């Protein structure tokens, strides 16, 4: 019996491999795979259900139908193993060989492989240097191809129509030249091709050509020819002589009841090929007329095309149900294809699924598992235990016992389940916290009980969500689940490093309620010796929960890592807070909880606890908080009632005033004073402001109540209104929702995003009228539609991110680089959004950090910034710190842990083997889905940002300007004429506390270095228009202003002023098409001296007259701004996708290509010529479209990379002109802006990791002495490595420039073709990989999952290291043995001589 088992083991031996190579298969190779030729199109005999001999399911070719039994039944059982039956020809072996044995068809005529023909760029076309159209004409028998011109004037590879061919035959005779049709002709040309000669010719041609187009073409061909030479692929193998046939069990034929069969589409496609092939062979035998043979050959070509890739050329072959048949290509591509359906994701056979309910008494690491479910899931363990206990003699008996559910089974189940972790998973699993391990507690009922605190990580709620349970079977799996995945070990969020097990909703409400204070309560003023005494007093009804009392508390301080008691002190507090302090861990200050505990406070508490105590304390504290929160929220009796929604009395008056203002503006519009756009904008502004006012009045009314104190005085304190408490505590609802309940709903958006100018003045408590209800439906529906669409978009973004980052793993401790990124505090307007301390927390310094204004070192180079350091950085007011970053890491494969810094989810330096690429992708993608789902929470209420028209500072300080260019106007104010100016306010320590952007045309009321005080207005501007400012005093001359043709003259009825409006170019008459209206500024006294010219866009308004004199800083024209649209997250998700795809915006900004002085050259019809002359006299020309507004003027000095014309930034330009660091800062800043807008906190690290992957490629500018071709793209790491080698050999180095690739492109351009093929464009990737003979070294995670090995990350990282070490050791041993044997032989030979 043992030996038999050994035989089974031998059959399943797998070979170890380190790489996979893909290439073209030669006819010999295909025949070597095959176990026999398939000659007939028959499948199986419908009576006997046995496969037909030499048919598509032939047992002789593909193997036996049943294990160890030949087809005719002569040989059965194991003893005839590997015997070939002489009667039916079937080998006696396992039936599973039918899944791996291939067959083949000998084709009667060669056939071109459609992938190499039609997959762009066409490899055949490129190699033969012919157009795809021409090759197709030859292949499908429409034209002849000259394969050997002989001595005739015909040219090699010339195309001849039938007429031309016969003419040539008549003229030269058929012995003089050779011309063929079909794949045969192509094959002849390819087999005659001498690749080395071709490569040499191409190199010579590319050196001799001046044409860029030709050079590109030569380089493309040279690359293909070189790759064919290197890979050993022969070009003629792109044409098939032998067609391989898939093993029969991979294209099954299943008999259904009623004598019908279900079959794989491939069988139909193979049948067509075999039928046509047999017919062609017969025709050739019979020597049929050429035209019939040709037609049959064409049909064979088409049949093979549709087998390999149906529908790629011509119409797809349909099945009998009128849908295209699924070809081999369709089998592997797309979501249902082999890669994504079966290799990257598989269904699990050991799992359960049920609804989840709340388990408020569970500990954090526990879950409640229904007994019924546990019994099914733990069956193998129960059987085993029953047998070892001797309760059941066989598995069968054990099975019976379990089925009958006898009492001892339940006892054994208890024992089996004890401390055996199970995995819980909630779909969609957006990040790794979507699967966590818990210890099961057996419960009655059929629902899984889940700990409320892990709901945040799973994004679960108890409104009918379902979860799946998986059982880790092996001991290694159990160990990993317990140490790495247990819920109590995953306390921090991997995106931001903040606690994720934060209590919410009821728990927060309970804690908030118990820690609120109230005056004039029973027991006010009592003094308690400790918290227990306070609890006893509360439970004996001597004091109320909110009474103000005094409490003696014990403080702790840290000694040798332990908290020891220190002084005692008395604090003013409330009874509730005293009770809460009983669960506070030693070492957490009472001051942290001596306030009404809202969600923010709880979050901070857990954070501080995690940082100061160990993990276990934190988890226990969170659990205790939860139990207490539930207890007191029950006692509070807080409910939701319509009387709690108090409508402010002043509301009616506010709305009345707003209506009067709107009426005024309407009148101004009807008189023609303002344009419709301006009217609309102003109306929106009025209603937005009113909405805010009503909301404020409502919050004042709901948020405060009058209470009488002990002395009988009335005091205004925070109210105990239920709705207010829910929102204020952060338990549920928000001020935005409260304003809709009892303020006014405000402005609504149309489905296209524009705001409807009639707001909803009612709220939900008053109720909506028909019209208002109808307007509301827009928002509600748009919310739902958006959610559905954006969820898909967000999922796709995550998928692309995972794909680009999947092979990035921490591979070493320190790469030793000095490079890094410079971090600064992020300041937006008057708020510090992110302090420098927070930004650098958990990062490693790249150079010494000095104390401000001294040379004393504060942090040494290579120091990991801790929490204490981070606080100190903020205190000291350090401006900027250079930290290590994964973008600048020098590790060849992966990233080193010093460049990455802290592991966000663990709070210590990241370990080797962590898959940081996938973590980054999940961290960025997960909130994407959250954001998309957030749209309908405010019910579509359009929160239109009221137009900002001035800068008012919040703090006292000194004003400093950056990039400010200005001119002084008549009133001695500064008028800003630069586009990227900013003003910063620094406090008395010199720390930057506020930063504002100043738009072009703004008026500034403070000088550089001037002192400002809080509330000062330092700048203002018109928010509704873009002005064009005159930079010198002078006279205005209008050019091409022709009334009725290029401009219209209008009069403002209110002011009586006239103004010009442009007529859009599209609407002008033919006569006016050539006219270009512009304003010239000339010297006041001399019209010949032109100071400047201003081209005008079509939407402009001009309030000047011709020849008018204007002062410097005057407004020449105004361009009205667009109507205000709601800023929904629509800006968000597509914006993030655009940034990561590195898309160029349509009208992107134009940056200066060099540093120097600007001048303007001769412009062309549509473009201006801008010349930058450097100090060395080198001129750089830039051509800029006339419609782009150029922000620079003649004679101005400009730096390389400065903005010349406004617009969204182009990341490719930033990389090219300003470098990698500038690009990294730009992408990080822009992505963070989107997420910050939604209040999502993501660490910069994750974005940097993705940017690193986008910068993987370089373009070779000069290949030096390397094997690269100029203009080729190559992997950055490979080029650096090669440069080291070239430098060591004293050869010419490679000159390159970094390329920025979008994530999709970067995923497809990865070194691993398996990973790229499983992502997108499968056929294109595989075609390219096979022609170039690509080798996949299986570095990334995806490739390893696909080939079924442990991933080289986490615990698998060590496994692969050990495997490689063993491999190297075995090779070394073999080498040493061989050397020893050789030296022994030599010795022997010497001795003999």
Curated annotation (Swiss-Prot):
Q: Which cysteines are joined by disulfide bonds?
A: none
Biological process terms in GO annotation: DNA-templated transcription
First-tier enzyme category under EC:
transferase
Q: Which cofactor does it need?
A: Mg(2+); Zn(2+)
CDD domains recorded = RNAP_beta'_C, RNAP_beta'_N
Listed under GO cellular component are: DNA-directed RNA polymerase complex
Instruction: Relay the cofactor remark from the entry.
Output: Binds 1 Mg(2+) ion per subunit.
Enzyme Commission number(s) from the entry: 2.7.7.6
InterPro entries from the entry? Answer: DNA-dir_RpoC_beta_prime (IPR045867), DNA-dir_RpoC_beta_prime_bact (IPR012754), RNA_pol_asu (IPR000722), RNA_pol_N (IPR006592), RNA_pol_Rpb1_1 (IPR007080), RNA_pol_Rpb1_3 (IPR007066), RNA_pol_Rpb1_3_sf (IPR042102), RNA_pol_Rpb1_4 (IPR007083)
Per UniProt, Zn(2+) 2 binds at 815, 889, 896, 899
In this chain, Zn(2+) 1 is annotated as bound at 70, 72, 85, 88
Family, similarity comment: Belongs to the RNA polymerase beta' chain family.
Query: What does the subunit section of this Swiss-Prot or TrEMBL entry state?
Result: The RNAP catalytic core consists of 2 alpha, 1 beta, 1 beta' and 1 omega subunit. When a sigma factor is associated with the core the holoenzyme is formed, which can initiate transcription.
Please identify the protein, giving its name as recorded. Answer: DNA-directed RNA polymerase subunit beta'
What organism is the protein native to?
Vesicomyosocius okutanii subsp. Calyptogena okutanii (strain HA)
């Amino acid at each position: 019996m043992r030996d038999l088992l050994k035989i089974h083991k031998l059959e399943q031996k797998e070979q170890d491999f380190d790489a996979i190579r893909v290439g073209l298969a030669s006819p010999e190779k295909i025949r070597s795979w095959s176990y026999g030729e398939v000659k007939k199109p028959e499948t199986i005999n419908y009576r006997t259900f046995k496969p037909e001999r030499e048919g598509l399911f032939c047992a002789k070719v593909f193997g036996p139908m049943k294990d160890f039994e030949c087809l005719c039944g002569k040989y059965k059982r194991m003893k005839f193993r590997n015997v070939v039956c002489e009667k039916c020809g079937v080998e006696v072996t396992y039936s599973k060989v039918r899944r791996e044995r291939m067959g083949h068809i000998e084709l009667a005529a060669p056939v071109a492989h459609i992938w190499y023909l039609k997959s762009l760029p066409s490899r055949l076309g490129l190699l033969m240097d012919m157009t795809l159209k021409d090759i197709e004409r030859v292949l499908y028998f429409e034209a002849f191809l000259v394969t050997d011109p002989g001595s005739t004037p015909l040219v090699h590879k010339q195309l001849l129509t039938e007429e031309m061919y016969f003419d040539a035959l008549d003229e030269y005779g058929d012995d003089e030249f050779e011309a063929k049709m079909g794949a045969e002709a192509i094959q002849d040309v390819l087999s005659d091709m001498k690749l080395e000669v071709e490569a040499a010719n191409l190199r010579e041609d590319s050196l001799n050509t001046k044409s860029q187009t030709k050079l590109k073409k030569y380089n493309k061909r040279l690359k293909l020819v070189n790759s064919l030479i290197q890979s050993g692929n022969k070009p003629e193998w792109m044409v098939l002589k032998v067609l391989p046939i898939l093993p029969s069990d991979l294209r099954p034929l299943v008999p259904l009841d009623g004598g019908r069969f279900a079959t794989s589409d491939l069988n139909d496609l193979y049948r067509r090929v075999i039928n046509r092939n047999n017919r062609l062979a017969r025709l050739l035998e019979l020597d049929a007329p050429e035209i019939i043979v040709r037609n049959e050959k064409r049909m064979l070509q088409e049949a093979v095309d549709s087998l390999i890739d149906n529908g790629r050329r011509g119409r797809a072959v349909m099945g009998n149900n009128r849908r295209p048949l699924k070809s081999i290509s369709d089998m592997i591509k797309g979501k249902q294809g082999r890669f994504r359906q079966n290799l990257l994701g598989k269904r699990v056979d050991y799992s359960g699924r049920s609804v989840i309910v709340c388990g408020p008494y569970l500990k954090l690491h526990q879950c409640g598992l229904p007994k019924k479910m546990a019994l099914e899931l733990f069956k193998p363990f129960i059987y085993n235990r029953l047998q070892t206990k001797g309760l059941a003699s066989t598995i069968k008996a054990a099975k019976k016992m379990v089925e009958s559910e006898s009492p001892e089974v339940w006892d054994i189940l208890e024992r089996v389940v004890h401390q055996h972790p199970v995995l819980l998973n909630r779909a969609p699993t957006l990040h790794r916290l979507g699967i966590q391990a818990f210890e099961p507690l057996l419960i009655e009922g059929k629902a899984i009980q889940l700990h409320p605190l892990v709901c945040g990580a799973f994004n679960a709620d108890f409104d009918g969500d379902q979860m799946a349970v998986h059982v880790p079977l092996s001991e290694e799996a159990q160990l990993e689940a317990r140490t790495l995945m247990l819920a109590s070990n995953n306390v921090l969020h991997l995106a931001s490093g903040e606690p994720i097990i934060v209590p919410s909703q009821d728990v927060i409400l309970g804690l908030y309620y118990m820690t609120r204070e109230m005056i004039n309560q029973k027991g006010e003023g009592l003094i308690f010796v400790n918290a227990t005494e306070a609890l006893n007093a509360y439970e004996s009804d001597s004091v109320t929960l909110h009474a103000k009392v005094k409490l003696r508390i014990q403080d702790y301080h840290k000694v040798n890592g332990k908290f020891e008691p220190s002084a005692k002190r008395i604090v003013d507090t409330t009874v509730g807070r005293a009770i809460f302090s009983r669960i506070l861990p030693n070492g957490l200050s009472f001051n942290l909880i001596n306030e009404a505990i809202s969600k923010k406070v709880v979050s901070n508490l857990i954070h501080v606890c995690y940082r100061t105590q160990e993990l276990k304390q934190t988890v226990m504290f969170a659990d205790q908080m939860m139990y207490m929160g539930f207890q007191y929220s029950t006692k509070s009796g807080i409910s939701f009632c319509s009387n709690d929604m108090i409508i402010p009395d002043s509301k009616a008056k506010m709305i009345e005033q707003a209506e009067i203002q709107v009426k005024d503006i309407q009148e101004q519009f009807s008189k023609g004073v303002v344009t419709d756009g301006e009217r609309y904008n102003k109306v929106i502004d009025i209603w937005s402001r009113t909405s805010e006012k009503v909301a404020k009045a409502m919050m004042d009314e709901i948020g405060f109540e009058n209470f009488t104190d002990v002395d009988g005085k009335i005091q205004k304190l925070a109210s105990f209104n239920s709705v207010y408490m829910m929102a204020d505590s952060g338990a549920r609802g928000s001020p935005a929702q409260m304003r809709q309940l009892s303020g006014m709903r405000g402005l609504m958006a149309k489905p296209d995003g524009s705001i409807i100018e009639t707001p909803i003045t009612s709220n939900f408590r008053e109720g909506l009228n028909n019209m208002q209800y109808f307007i509301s439906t827009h928002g509600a529906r748009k919310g739902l539609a958006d959610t559905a669409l954006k969820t898909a978009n967000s999922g796709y973004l995550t998928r692309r991110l995972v794909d680009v980052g999947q092979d990035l793993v921490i591979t070493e401790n320190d790469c030793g680089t000095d490079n890094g990124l410079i971090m600064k505090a992020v300041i937006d307007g008057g708020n510090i959004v992110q302090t420098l301390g927070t930004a650098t927390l958990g990062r490693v310094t790249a150079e010494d950090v000095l104390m401000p204004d001294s040379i004393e070192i504060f942090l040494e180079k290579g120091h990991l910034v801790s929490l204490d350091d981070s606080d100190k950085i903020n205190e000291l007011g350090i401006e900027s710190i250079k930290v290590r970053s994964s973008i600048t890491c020098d590790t060849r494969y992966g990233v080193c842990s010093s460049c990455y810094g802290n592991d966000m989810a663990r709070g210590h330096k990241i370990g080797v083997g962590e898959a940081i690429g996938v973590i980054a992708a999940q961290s960025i993608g997960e909130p994407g889905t959250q954001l998309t789902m957030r749209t309908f929470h405010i019910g579509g209420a359009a929160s239109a940002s009221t137009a900002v028209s001035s800068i008012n500072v919040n703090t006292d300080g000194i004003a400093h300007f950056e990039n400010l260019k200005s001119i002084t106007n008549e009133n001695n104010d500064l008028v800003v004429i630069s586009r990227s100016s900013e003003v910063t306010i620094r406090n008395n320590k010199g720390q930057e506390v506020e930063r504002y952007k100043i738009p072009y045309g703004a008026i500034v009321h403070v000088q550089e270095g001037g002192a400002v005080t809080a509330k000062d207005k330092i700048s203002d501007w018109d928010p509704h228009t873009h002005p064009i400012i005159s930079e010198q005093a002078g006279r205005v001359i209008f050019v091409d202003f022709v009334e009725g043709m290029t401009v219209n003259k209008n009069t403002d009825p209110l002011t009586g002023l006239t103004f010009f409006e442009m007529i859009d170019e599209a609407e002008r008459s033919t006569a006016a098409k050539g006219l270009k209206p512009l304003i010239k500024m000339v010297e006041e006294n001399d019209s010949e001296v032109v100071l400047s010219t201003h081209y005008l866009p079509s939407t402009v308004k001009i309030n000047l007259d011709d020849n008018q004199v204007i002062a410097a800083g005057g407004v020449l024209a105004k361009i009205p701004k667009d109507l205000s649209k709601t800023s929904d997250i629509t800006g968000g998700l597509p914006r993030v996708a655009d940034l990561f795809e590195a898309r160029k915006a349509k009208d992107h900004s134009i940056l200066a290509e060099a540093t120097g002085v600007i001048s303007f050259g001769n412009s062309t019809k549509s473009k201006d010529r801008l010349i930058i002359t450097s100090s060395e006299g080198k001129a750089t020309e830039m051509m800029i479209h006339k419609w782009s507004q150029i922000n620079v003027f003649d004679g101005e000095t400009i730096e390389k990379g400065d903005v010349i014309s406004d617009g969204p930034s182009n990341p490719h330009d930033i990389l090219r002109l300003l470098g990698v660091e500038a690009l990294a800062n730009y992408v990080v800043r822009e992505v963070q802006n989107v997420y910050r807008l939604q209040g999502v906190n993501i660490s910069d690290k994750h974005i940097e990791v993705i940017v690193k992957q986008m910068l993987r490629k370089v373009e070779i500018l000069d290949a030096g002495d390397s094997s690269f071709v100029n203009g080729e793209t190559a992997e950055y790491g490979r080029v650096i490595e090669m440069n080291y080698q070239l430098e060591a050999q004293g050869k010419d180095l490679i000159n390159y420039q970094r390329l920025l690739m979008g994530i999709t492109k970067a995923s497809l351009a990865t070194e691993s073709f398996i990973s790229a093929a499983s992502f997108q464009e499968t056929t294109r990737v595989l075609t390219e990989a096979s022609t170039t003979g690509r080798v996949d070294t299986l570095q990334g995670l995806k490739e390893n999952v696909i080939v079924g090995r442990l991933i080289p990350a986490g615990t698998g990282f060590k496994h692969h290291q050990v495997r490689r070490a063993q491999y190297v050791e075995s090779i070394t041993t073999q080498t040493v043995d061989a050397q020893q044997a050789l030296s022994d032989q030599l010795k022997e030979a010497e001795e003999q001589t």
